């Protein structure tokens, strides 16, 4: 048997064995909230063999994915070896960028919706970065792991509880990373607050507030290409929090969710759905497809989460109403509070002298509590861009961990728990706000897992 044939045989054998084991995990259990039997061992704190060079395959290089072309082309120890996108225009843009960096020419794939499978079959791809429309996140991440690759997927990780369990099971079975790339966890402010929390500045944590408040009605004008061409339909199909992780991810890390505490249940309600129909009526002809949709998603959704330890988290979603951008980023403890947008802090023994007034002068707080990772890499991150540097820092950290044999900062359990707010909020809104339980995606490991440390 030739080397190529042997590799193909082993890969096919792995996929067959994995499919058989995953089939044994009853889909009915995944869907109903019963914890399914594990198909493999936990990947909490998973460390994989060090990689001298991390060979990157990119699936999706459009509005979001083109940033990854730039970031991985600039990071030492990373090499883009394959790129796939069904849109030849954005593929050509990615090729132009690669050439400008003077990097080795990667393989390109663009023929059909499943061309990404040609990328997955390559032996020169170690990790697969998925930046595609949401519906493709689950199947692509699963197939990447079954092909022996580590999967790095854009937010949200998947759209249903069953899909989230499927990714957890696949990661455990294959012993591959499946990281949902929540970039906001790498923002300067979020890292600073994480540092503050770990140093006990706020005392015992009680409550957090998170949000994705970002007016995006203009995306409705993207009909055939770009994000609005597929994202708009979600507002006509679901009533809940469509996009919870940007705000929730950092707050969950502050609270050591999945590492000493976990999300227990949520209750969710939505406001009336008025803004998108009004926008469509104002901006499009009466017979336009945007005016044919029945928008059911409330303009503002508010979900309240209770953790097993009794803490509370408010998570809001609004991409429709005219208001300033916010992720809230609030964390309240027994000794004080930090709130973002704009940044401010109040402590019982804080610098302002009174917790009845906000201290909005953050310079001194940055000087004392800037996260060591930002202190080390912040200047380079800002120079390379991506939402103020958080995107570059996230990519740098991914490569650093893989090259140095360290566990990633986010794992499949984090991505599953944070993404679960979407389907659970939809279920709660549809049930008059009655509470819905979060699955324990860790299968109890959260009780003994080490807290996420301060990494530099």
From Swiss-Prot:
Cofactor note: Binds 1 NAD(+) per subunit. The NAD(+) cannot dissociate.
Entry-linked Pfam families: GFO_IDH_MocA (PF01408), Glyco_hydro_109_C (PF21252), TAT_signal (PF10518)
GO terms, molecular function: hydrolase activity, acting on glycosyl bonds; nucleotide binding
EC primary class: hydrolase
Residues involved in NAD(+) binding: 63-64, 85, 134-137, 154-155, 183, 243
Record PTM text: Predicted to be exported by the Tat system. The position of the signal peptide cleavage has not been experimentally proven.
Cofactor: NAD(+)
InterPro entries the UniProt entry points to: Gfo/Idh/MocA-like_OxRdtase_N (IPR000683), Gfo/Idh/MocA_oxidrdct_glycsds (IPR050463), Glyco_hydro_109_C (IPR049303), NAD(P)-bd_dom_sf (IPR036291), TAT_signal (IPR006311), TAT_signal_bac_arc (IPR019546)
PROSITE patterns on file: TAT
Protein purpose: Glycosidase.
Name this polypeptide is given: Glycosyl hydrolase family 109 protein 2
Organism: Shewanella sp. (strain MR-7)
